[in-house]
Amino acid sequence: MTTKTAPAKGEWLEAWDPENEQTWDKSLAWRTLWVTTFVLTLAFIAWFLPSAIIPKLNLLGYSFSKGQLYWMAAMPGLAAGLLRLVWMVLPPIMGTRKMVSLTSLLLIASTLGWGVRVQSPTAPYWELMVLAFLAGIGGGAFSGFMPSTSYFLSLIHI
C-alpha cells in the first residue's frame, strides 16, 4: 500500500481564479508571465535556429547531400509535432515549474549545441540530427505552453 504525500505549501496552487480579487496574486501572475515569456521566446529561437543554419552547413565545410540536409531541416518540425502532445500532457502531471525548468535546460543545450558544433565541420550527421530533434522541443513547448499562459492573468486587474 502506498501513500501519497501532500505537496508542500506554496508548491501547488490550491485555488486560482484570476477574476476573483481574493484568490488572485498579482505579483505571482506577473512573475509567471515574465518567466513564461522568456521560455517561450527561447523555445521559438531554438526551434527556428536550425532552419537558418542547416542550409549553410555545406558552406561551413560540411559535405552533406541534399537529402541529408532536407531531413535535418525537417526534423525540428517533425519533433515539434510529436512533442507538442507530450508538452500538453506533462505539465499537469509533473507541474509547470518543473516542466519550464526542464524545457529551459533542453532548449539551452540544443541552442548551445548548434553554436558549438557548427564551428568545426567534424560533427557526424547523427549528432546534428539529434540537435535538430532537440530543437523541435522548442516548437512542441511553444505550442504546448502558449495556451496556458493566459490563465494566470486577468484583463480586469491589469
Could you describe each region identified by the protein language model?
Residues 1-39, 43:
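Cytosolic juxtamembrane N-terminal segment immediately preceding the first transmembrane helix
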Residues 31-62:
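Extracytoplasmic
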Residues 74-89:
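Central cavity-lining transmembrane alpha-helices of secondary-active solute carriers
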Residues 106-121:
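C-terminal ends and interior cores of transmembrane alpha-helices
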Residues 125-140:
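Hydrophobic core of transmembrane alpha-helices in multi-pass small-molecule transporters
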Residues 141-153:
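Intracellular juxtamembrane helix-capping segments at the cytosolic ends
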Residues 156-158:
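Conserved small/polar residues in nucleotide/adenosyl-binding loops
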